[in-house]
Amino acid sequence: MVAALFGCQPYLVQRLLAVDNDFAAILKGNGQYAAVDFAVDIAVAIPVVQAFFNGQPELISQAMKFTVVHCCILFLSDGGSIAAWGQGFKVCTSAAAFRHDSSVTGIMMSLCSERFVSSLGRSYTTSFPVSGKHYDQVYRASILTLTELKKTTNKPHCDSA
C-alpha cells in the first residue's frame, strides 16, 4: 500500500497514520488485507472523473496533469481513493476490506498539502512535501453519488503499473 499509494515514499503514509489513529489501528488489526481490497484501472477511473467534473474536458485534462505533477488523490466517501501515478489512474479502496462494504456513495477531491482532508471531511494540519514544495490550499468538491462502483474482485494489493 505504501509504495502504491505514494510512489515509493513511505514517510508520507507514516505521516498520514500519525494524524489518524483510528486508521492506524485498522491497519494494525488487518495486516494482509488492509493494503487495498480491489483496483479498477483507468477505464473506470476516467468516466468517474468525467462525471465528477460535470463532463467538462478542460477540467479533466487539468486535473489529470495536476495529479501526475502534484500527487493529487481523489477520496471516495467509503475511505478508498483514486490515486494518480505517472502512468495513469488506479481506483483503490481499503475501506471495503475493513468493513466488507464496497458501495461507493460519494467522492471528494483534495490535494496532498499541509492541510489533509480525509474522506470524512475532517481537516488535519500536517506536512506533505510534494514536488519539493508545501501547498496549504485544499480543493474540495461537492459529494457525488457513485453507485456504479461496486466490489467486483479481491486483489491483495494495488498495482502501480
Swiss-Prot record:
InterPro entries: YzcX. One of its GO terms (cellular component) is cell outer membrane. It comes from the Bacteria. This is Protein YzcX.
